[in-house]
């Protein structure tokens, strides 16, 4: 019922749109009354003018909407429709209302009757959305059907070219554009009017009148058992047979249901290509013109009975429904894809905005980075200059330090040299001291020797003086004794001479001892001077290597060369020794 209602609404929409003169979506009440009356008449629905007046009591015009004509149409007409009206009459009534306003004035290769059939086919194949259009897939399906019915070859490349231009302009064709497309012969070149008209009629019978198969066959009568040629028309639940193909004189129907069956019969009584259609109360024996026709009819009837068992619609309606569901699915997928694309676009825009914000931030960051880089470069240049200065200064300091290290090394070497020299000086001082000590010992020995010699000389001198005195005394003695004394004198003179010689020898030895003493004294002075010189050098070097520290509180003797290397007691001892030496000399 829902599918029937949708098909009826499409034709009514054309009629209502034709009555809408100013395209406002509204039609006057008087026109709606006429339309409603005509609809009730062709649809065999009781007409209630009071309900119409009541429905549009406050409106001069009624738009086709939920608030306008549609609620009345649904409630008082469409809900009461039964499947007992003439669909062709209904469609022709709606066609009559809209054809004059919409059909093109350009000359067409088809008749108005053919245009009407195309219009009805359009309503069957169009989408369930308003305004009604037929999409490219259904146009291709219809054109293929027509080309097949005309016995021509389908030009897919030509349609693809047309489809490209078609898709670029709009989503589909209106009924009048479809009529003009078929009527101008674009896809039926080389075909005459009659062939095109027959093809349109064949497709109309299949799609609109649900004619599954039709053709001439022989039928055996039930009463007289004779064979008569009839025009058979197979529909989803019935096989009708007529005197001729003009369908004016109907001779009977074969009602089909799920209990019917079709069987092939062998040839008999001179009749060939026989088959049997068994129904609940009757059996129909039919003869086809040839085996191919026989097989086609058996297959068609068998398929029809099978569809009745399954409760399925006719193949063309089922195919249309599948195509619609496929398009609906594709549309849903496309809408889902578009929704996803919109979401992706929104996300992309959001990402773009984020990227733009990030780009701006990056630009700002780049600007800041450039500024920072500039500052960094400037700072780097400054740091480099400062580092260069620091490096130069460090090099200078390093050079100075190296010079200082070299100087310190030189000073250390000099210090070590002075230490070595000082050690040598100490050794030489010790040698000088040893020489001085030895000289003192030699001086002491010489002095003792000199003292001994002086003592011996004094003793000899005293002895000589004694002898001289004795000699003088002897002179004063007697002359007698003088000779004796002379002799003694001679002896004594000899002894004196010997003593004088000894004295001279002692004097010589004393002089030699004195010379030796002078030499020793000179050596002592030289040793003393040498010792003093080495002591001064040692003191000088000790002063160079001595750490600076608080001086001693004890008083020191000061010489021409600085502090003395000996104490006051040592000085007194030396003065005492010197005086003794002077006294001895």
UniProtKB/Swiss-Prot annotation:
The PH domain is essential for phosphatidylinositol 3,4,5-trisphosphate binding. Tyrosine-phosphorylated. Gene3D superfamilies: Pleckstrin-homology domain (PH domain)/Phosphotyrosine-binding domain (PTB) (2.30.29.30). InterPro entries: EF-hand-dom_pair, EF_hand_dom, PH-like_dom_sf, PH_domain. It is found in: Cytoplasm; Cell membrane; Nucleus; Cell projection, Lamellipodium. Keywords: Cell membrane, Cell projection, Coiled coil, Cytoplasm, Cytoskeleton, DNA-binding, Membrane, Nucleus, Phosphoprotein. SMART domains: PH (SM00233). It comes from Homo sapiens (Human). This is Switch-associated protein 70.
